[in-house]
Each structure stands twice: as structure tokens, then as C-alpha cells.
Amino acid sequence: MPLILGTNSIKDTGYDVANSLRFNSGSSDYLTRTPSSATNQDLWSLSFWIKRSNLGSYQSIYGVYANSTNQETLAFDDSDRLYWQLYQSSAVKGQLTTNRVFRDVSAFYNILIVYDSANGTAGNRMRMYINGVEETSFATDTNPSSGQDSQWNSTTAHTIGRINTANYMNGYISELVAVDGTALSPTDVGEFDEDSGIWKPIDVSGLTFGTNGFYLDFEDSSALGNDVSGNNNDFTVNNLTAIDQSTDTCTNNFATLNPLDKPGTGNLPGFAEGNLHYNKTATGSGNNSQANSTIAVNTGKWFFEIKALDSNAIIVGIDNADNPTYDSHGNSINSSDGGIAYYNNGQKIVYGTASSYGASWTTNDIIGIAINLDDNEITFYKNGSSQGAISITTTGINYRPAIMNNGYNSTSSAYMNFGNPPFSISSGNSDGNGYGNFEYSVPSGYYALNTKNLAEYG
């Protein structure tokens, strides 16, 4: 069983979502659309599924920005709370800020917001639903006056992934749905699975979207802003490419690196591209920093890749997720009860002991890692060529993919590919279930680390 398993973890969802769109603040990614005419600014709904990556900074999910005194946004604030504010004529006209924080980077949240300023009950004029349940606990709860227009559905530019020219978002969005003129309920966009109780999406294509409504499913890699509602309310794509189309979705959740899984004293690496880009600059001896996967396993056969982005010292492999012995910097992959790794100088590190193993590797090399927890061995591949099997002698524990720099006054950087690559793949290979997009062939019987495979083989 996986150690860390997100809320979207059932094998048979009934309705499958094919794609999400990965936003990265470092690339200034966003979508934009300016409605040609204003419609229902007092009644509308917005639903989407979102998986966060970077935390602790203000990130706008949507923004409608006319000027500094007239704007509207839904965002995660710098305390990771959900924040929805309508600001007009230099005054707050409506605001909800949750007490709850949203720090789970391993799963998708479904967020539904409903604006209905004509509602006779003031507390029902701005409503939030999280995974099918209405949010009722707020640090700030300011109700709009009756009939107060919002900025949404105005002729001001609507952006997804930023507001104005700042506060860019980091994470994945799927099933982005806007309905003009209707107050949706959670059951219009999702349902609780009868066996697991997990909130899951349903087919929304039959909704009445209204004039300015839209449905972005992100399935067309050549037109990522394509509206499939039938309204042709397409969004313009900015700094997003086909590489940012991901199969990491609310019905098949893939592993990423986990910025929360870090002991020690703040010696954190940098994370980008949906927590698939590892970057760490060592500023002295021992200034190394390990990053771990959101998913750990103790049975089955699993495969992932990394792409080296420089020639500096780095190691990759699997680490004890249950009770590792951390050094003063919070690293454990190279400790006696840690795990097994492949060093880019060609050595292997097996439970803290380094010895000769295979070929060295450098910039742009692809390292494949095949984890066999049924037969207790791990095999590393360099550009598709096996470097030999290594025995896993510490059994009965959970292992997690891990990566760590190992240099002195240098920067080590790599892309992780758990089947949802943040870089261009030239060949394209999936596992036996058809999941994942890998540069080299997946060994027979091995699978990508995602929740559908985990439900079947984990």
C-alpha cells in the first residue's frame, strides 16, 4: 500500500478526466479572455479541480482586474488560506477568507464558488464548496449587498493563473467550468463514490453554461484554452505549451516531489514545474538537500525517470519512508538504513556504503529507476541501458523515490518524470496499462506511480 495517497485514489471513477494544465509562476503562465459583452454579474458559478505545488505565497487562481480600485480575485493567500474578494471603488464589497489552510500537495481539491448577490439570505451570496461540502468557517466573511455586481462576466479581461501582472499560480488545474446565470450545487459537478466515500468528478458537458460560460478540459495540446462547452469562449494561452498539458488529474493522481516532506532546519531545495523540477545550490560542505516523492510503496513494481539538467553531483534512488535516520541537513537516502541510490559519478550507494556500479551520467542523460518490491531488487538505467540489478535487503518497509544534490558550492538540477514529464519527450512510452509518458521503454510488468496503478498493483 502507498504511504501517502491523495484523496483522488480510486481505480474506477466512472468518469475519467484525461488532462490537467500545469501552471508555473517562474514561467509567468496564465490564460486570458475578455468577454465581448457583459452578462450576469450578480449570478454565476465557477468549479475546478486543483492540485497545489508551491506553498506559502499569494497565488491567484483567477483575476478580473480593471484597475487598482476595481478588481476581483480568487486566490491562495500567503498563509495558504482560500481567499475570494470583490473590491470596487476602493472598498471591499464582498470577501471570504477561510480558516482552513490548503497545504496538501499530493491530491486535487474540487473548489466550487457561487456568486448570487440577489439571494435573500445575505450569507448565501458568496458560497464556497470544497470536495462537495460547503465551507462555513471563515476568518473574514463580508457579504455583498443585495444586487451587488461582481467583476466576473464583465467586459474586463478575465485571467486564470494570475491577477493583473502578478501573483502567478503554481499547480495543476483540471475540469475548469464557469456557468453564467445559474447557482450550481456540488452535485452538478461531482459525487461521493458509494464504496470509498471519496469525492469524484462527474460529466459536466450537459450543463447549461450560459452566454459567458465555458468548459476547459485541456485535452487539445495545440489549443489549451479551447472551450468545449459549445460557446467557443476560448482563452488565449500565455507562456503555456503542449509540455504543460499533464495526465496528472483528479481521477488519476501522479506522484510529484513533496516540498512538505523535509525535516531539518530549512535546508530546502527549490521546486518548480508542478514539483517536478528539483534545484539546489550547495553553499558549502555538507549543504545537501534531499527531496522525496508524494507516494511511497512497499509492494509491486514501479518505474520513474529523471533528466539531469547539469553535470554537478547528484544522486537518485529510493529511500526508507518509515523511519529513516536523518543527518543534520535532513537527508537520509545515503544513510545506513536509508535506501539505494545511483550517483552521477557511476557509483551506487547501498544503505550508506558507496561502491562502483555503472556508467557516469551528466547533462541531458535520462536515468530510469525500476523498483521491484515483489522480488526485492532495484535496477537503474542510463538512457535505456540497464546498469544491473541491486538487491533490496531491508524489506517490509515503505520506500519512496528520492533525489539529492551532493556537491560543494555548485547547483544540481534535474527533472523528475513519474509519467507526467515537465520536459519534451522524443519517443513516448507508457506502461502496460497505458499510463505515463516516458523517454525510454518501461520494463515489462512495471508501472507508473499513479493512483489507478496503485489501486490495482499497490
Residue locations for each model-derived region?
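Low-complexity, glycine/proline/serine-rich flexible segments
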Residues: 1-42, 79-83, 88-93, 154-159, ...
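Extended recognition patches within non-cytosolic domains
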Residues: 2-19, 26-27, 120-122, 127, ...
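Extracellular glycan-interaction surfaces
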Residues: 3-25, 47-56, 73-147, 341-344, ...
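Extracellular glycan-recognition modules
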Residues: 28-85, 90, 120-122, 182-187, ...
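Extracellular/lumenal carbohydrate-interaction signature centered on repeated Trp-anchored short motifs
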Residues: 34-46, 99-109, 151-154, 165-172, ...
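Short hydrophobic/aromatic patches on beta-strands that form ligand-binding or substrate-lining surfaces
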Residues: 46-54, 111-113, 160, 173-177, ...
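Conserved, ordered domain cores of eukaryotic regulatory proteins
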Residues: 52, 254-342
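Extracellular glycan-interaction patches encoded by glycine-rich segments
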Residues: 87, 149-173, 405-409
